[in-house]
A protein has these predicted regions:
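Alpha-helical transmembrane segments and their helix-start/interface "positive-inside/aromatic belt" motifs
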Residues: 1-6, 72-77, 212-218
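Hydrophobic alpha-helical segments
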Residues: 54-182
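Membrane-interface junctions at the ends of membrane-embedded or membrane-associated helices
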Residues: 1, 150-159, 202-208
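N-terminal signal-anchor transmembrane alpha helix
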Residues: 1-18
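Extracytosolic and intramembrane catalytic regions of membrane-associated proteins
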Residues: 238-445
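Internal/C-terminal transmembrane anchor helices
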Residues: 165-186, 191-240
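Solvent-exposed, well-ordered loop and adjacent helix/strand elements within mature globular domains
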Residues: 13-53
Length: 445
């Protein structure tokens, strides 16, 4: 039962991350920041690590259920769970007000503020978990891994016989289907798992050498690799972000007040120095307003800073989209004008104008020319300033104007760099990678 549950969850978890390996890469980059784990040397390998973890997690899940390479599978699962449990514990206990010492590029010691990762990315954007929730989840999985280790090293686990395999694989598919349909609103995981199991079982029947289990593993890796290749070169199969097809950007930008909902409550962290001990003390603005006129406070503390971090006191509705801007050359945000345009809008999105320079531009120009002649609005939206946008537009003969937006938000809008977004009345109609830019005729058919 432990093999079935842990293996099935590994398959689902790995597939969700593999579906959006770029998003998982961004999460790894957060962990590598100096204020977090301080591993800047790994940033250039973030995508490779993302793919390795995604495929490795699926492979371990399949191997657990079918009983392949039990000692190796159990050991790697134990190591992985120990690491993930430590990481989520570290994340859950991160103090945003604390500082840490790091050694910078010059070799000097520098004190910087902690950078706390707010979500672990275990299930991508599909199931956002707080660090504490992620830690509890990993703790439970770690406990379930213990019987798997015991069974593997006592010789109780082996490659499934036909009857046992049928029971375990069927049970796993039921668990994956229930998880996918109930929590992910996505039935693809059960299809993917069925294909992976079919490949593994087919190779088990086809080969009888001592390397059979390694050949089965290779087959599953090929299945994972093909899926990963598709999502990296096109777009995620399932999009859980607020810019997904069918989502209204207008509605997702509305505040709690606009929707008649209760918003979260925040306070600002103020810093004061105790005159007697000379130690700094953090006092929240909501508490400060109650004591700032008290004689003991006036006499015992002096102000250091009112510019502290914001602290959430209570949860509430927060806009799904908060930082989407369309800034023109004069520094004006024209986002409302674009979103309220009555008709169709095509947005050429580039999170990194230099890295995506010219990719798909010929197809984009042809599409834009036809679309604009039919009254569509077409714009470019990049991370670059106005002058760089204008240079790009001139160099590649783009017939549409370019605007600027925050790079982090552009990464959320579309994973491909560049990518294309089609909106109508503020609602996302479709998105494409630069490799898949359509012709205008296909849009109006």
């Amino acid at each position: 039962m432990c093999r079935l549950l842990v293996g099935s969850l590994f398959i689902v978890s790995g597939l969700i991350k593999s579906n959006d390996a770029m998003g998982f890469m961004y999460k790894l980059e957060e962990y590598f920041e100096p204020g977090a784990l301080n591993l800047p040397g790994l940033e250039e390998y973030a995508l490779s690590l993302s793919v390795l973890i995604c495929i490795g997690e699926i492979l371990l899940g399949v191997a657990m259920v079918i009983g392949a390479l039990p000692k190796l599978t159990a050991t790697l699962t134990g190591v992985l769970m120990a690491f993930f449990t430590w990481l989520t514990w570290y994340t859950a206990n991160c103090d945003p007000f604390a500082t840490k010492m790091i050694v910078d590029a010059t070799g000097a010691s520098v004190e910087i503020a902690n950078q706390c990762v707010l979500a672990c990315g275990c299930f991508g954007n599909a199931i956002p978990l707080t660090p504490y929730e992620s830690f509890i989840k990993d703790l439970v999985l770690s406990v379930l891994t213990v019987p798997i280790l015991i069974g593997a090293f006592n010789g109780w686990t082996r490659l499934n016989e036909k009857r046992e395999g049928l029971v375990l694989i069927t049970g796993s598919l039921v668990v994956i289907y229930a998880f996918g349909a109930g929590m992910l609103h996505w039935n693809f995981p059960v299809l993917f798992a069925a294909i992976a199991y079919a490949v593994a079982e087919g190779l088990k029947v086809r080969f009888s050498s001592k390397y059979r289990e390694w050949i089965m593993a290779a087959g599953v890796i090929v299945v994972c690799g093909l899926f990963q290749y598709y999502t990296l070169n096109h777009l995620p199969v399932k999009d859980y972000r607020p810019y997904a097809v069918g989502e209204s950007v207008i509605e997702n930008r509305k505040s709690a007040d606009e929707l008649g909902l209760e918003g979260p409550q925040y306070a600002t962290a103020y810093t004061f120095k105790n005159k007697e001990t000379l130690e700094d003390t953090i006092i929240l603005s909501t508490d400060w307003i109650k004591i700032y006129n008290e004689p003991w406070f006036k006499e015992g503390f002096e102000t250091v800073s009112f510019d502290g971090d914001e602290v959430k006191l209570s949860d509430g509705y927060e806009p799904l989209i908060m930082d989407f801007q369309i800034v023109d050359g004069d520094g004006e945000d024209v986002v409302d004008e674009i979103l309220q345009f009555e008709g169709d809008v095509l947005i050429h999105v580039s999170k990194d104008l230099d890295a995506g320079a010219g990719l798909g531009q010929e197809a984009l120009n042809a599409l834009a020319t036809q679309a604009m002649s039919k009254g569509w609005k077409v714009i470019g939206l990049t991370n670059a300033p106005f002058d760089q946008n204008e240079s790009y537009r001139t160099k590649f003969n783009a017939p549409y104007p370019f605007y600027t937006c925050d790079q982090t938000e552009l990464k959320i809008v579309v994973r491909s760099n560049p990518g294309l977004v089609w909106m109508r009345d503020g609602i996302i109609q479709e998105k494409w990678s630069w490799r898949d830019v359509p012709t205008f005729d296909t849009l109006v058919d």
